Amino acid sequence: MLNEFPIFDYEDIQLIPNKCVIKSRAEADTSVTLGNHTFKLPVVPANMQTILDENVAEQLAKGGYFYIMHRFDEAGRIPFIKRMHNQGLIASISVGVKDYEYDFVRQLKTDAPEYITIDIAHGHADSVISMIQHIKKELPDTFVIAGNVGTPEAVRELENAGADATKVGIGPGKVCITKVKTGFGTGGWQLAALRWCVKAARKPIIADGGIRTHGDIAKSIRFGASMIMIGSLFAGHIESPGKTIEVDGEQFKEYYGSASQYQKGAYKNVEGKRILLPAKGHLQDTLTEMEQDLQSAISYAGGRQVADLKHVDYVIVKNSIWNGDASH
């Protein structure tokens, strides 16, 4: 039962250092393998319209990073797969569970993407299970990611249906208001939910949401994530598709949730909101900084590679590390 587990989130945890065994953090290997491909970092930008478009997806793939294209340009998905494959790049797309998506999946047989993410706010659903089974039947070589979920039962069911990885996180994101609108979710205890779900998993888990700092990436790996999906830290870059807005002479970028009225174009079943983020520099600068910070984390863990972070000890500090020092 969940009540037997300690409940905590990212800011409540500090990892405990081990003796360093490498001469320089540059020796630390941050690469991870998901399915048949290896990527430079265990992170993936959230598949949201204000985070990535086709150009950003292409930039990420060319750089050796994992990406998941959002599902909000439905007609553009097949041309996108062709565009990527024509350049020798992997194609990674998202689908929903509506009836017409079944026909869409059948159309992919001639040029199947390497990765498909079934992208639903509440992924522990019969509709998701039947879509997993459909994709696995039609495209047996495609790696299927399914989500989002927040319980071990959900992880087990989606894995048993054929999912190759599950995405854990119900509403912990910065622009997600599921917890406010519905009373449900993993907001405020996302890291504990990840730990709980990992115990049931036989396949990779993608932690999705609640990442506020680069150190949270290392913490996610410690608690069992194979890959970490990140929204707000990847939003607001020069390349980001969000609108640039000027307020009192300062540049901001628009960032909104996937179930917001801004994305839906209608105010119904809204579980996302819009915020403005100060405009950042280039996306590659953030990726490089994430890589360097993760290399430092691996060196603190006394390791040489990402998996070594899984074995460090930790302490639950309940917010004390941030007290009086919001600058971090």
Curated annotation (Swiss-Prot):
Q: Which residues bind NADP(+)?
A: 205-228
- Enzyme kind, highest EC tier: oxidoreductase
Record keywords: NADP, Oxidoreductase
Q: Which residues form the active site?
A: C176
Quote a single Gene Ontology cellular component term.
cytosol
Catalyzed chemical reaction(s): IMP + NH4(+) + NADP(+) = GMP + NADPH + 2 H(+)
UniProt function note: Catalyzes the irreversible NADPH-dependent deamination of GMP to IMP. It functions in the conversion of nucleobase, nucleoside and nucleotide derivatives of G to A nucleotides, and in maintaining the intracellular balance of A and G nucleotides.
Task: Indicate what this protein is called per its UniProt record.
Answer: GMP reductase
* Organism, scientific name: Streptococcus pneumoniae (strain JJA)
Gene (name only):
guaC
